[in-house]
């Protein structure tokens, strides 16, 4: 991130590096717990796993205050329009973590008529966390992967 340190005490770096560093340490998640994966998401927020180490300390109740949504559980056809509405109300840049087999591809209920076979059919997903249910460690690993993805993005378009 730091490209050079001058003798006068200045640090030179790019705008993208500074902005992406700030974004990785200030993820504001919103829980969208639909099934048993939500329990593991709650475990990740407890003191044992301490999700605040990664900058995702407080789960927001309002989509307008969050920039990350963690979809944990089975997304049904009736819930899909409400989920899309919540996603549209989130602040930019929006990020989505799909947590668990049901959110990733329908899971155990894949062949049911009322289940959306993956939340990526409704919103774009950044990180998939596999498992049924995935452990709290797997969710933390997914957050770390999202942070790596944020660091690789470019804020300023290059010509």
Curated annotation (Swiss-Prot):
SUPFAM superfamilies: HydA/Nqo6-like. InterPro entries: NADH_UbQ_OxRdtase-like_20kDa, NADH_UQ_OxRdtase_20Kd_su. PROSITE patterns: COMPLEX1_20K. It is a peripheral membrane protein. NDH-1 is composed of 14 different subunits. Subunits NuoB, C, D, E, F, and G constitute the peripheral sector of the complex. NDH-1 shuttles electrons from NADH, via FMN and iron-sulfur (Fe-S) centers, to quinones in the respiratory chain. Couples the redox reaction to proton translocation (for every two electrons transferred, four hydrogen ions are translocated across the cytoplasmic membrane), and thus conserves the redox energy in a proton gradient. This is NADH-quinone oxidoreductase subunit B. It comes from Albidiferax ferrireducens (strain ATCC BAA-621 / DSM 15236 / T118). The gene is nuoB.
């Amino acid at each position: 991130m730091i490209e050079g340190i001058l003798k006068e005490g200045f640090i030179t770096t790019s705008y993208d590096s500074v902005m992406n560093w700030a974004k990785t340490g200030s993820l504001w998640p919103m829980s969208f717990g639909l099934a048993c994966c939500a329990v593991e998401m709650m475990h990740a927020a407890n003191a044992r796993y301490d999700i605040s180490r990664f900058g995702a300390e407080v789960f927001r109740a309002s989509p307008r205050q969050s920039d990350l949504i963690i979809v944990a559980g089975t997304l049904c056809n009736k819930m899909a329009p409400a989920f899309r509405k919540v996603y549209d109300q989130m602040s930019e840049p929006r990020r989505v973590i799909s947590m668990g087999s049901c959110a990733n591809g329908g899971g155990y209920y894949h062949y049911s008529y009322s289940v959306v076979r993956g939340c990526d059919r409704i919103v774009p997903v950044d990180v998939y966390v596999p498992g049924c249910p995935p452990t709290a460690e797997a969710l933390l690993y997914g957050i770390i992967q999202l942070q790596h993805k944020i660091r690789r993005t470019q804020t300023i378009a290059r010509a």
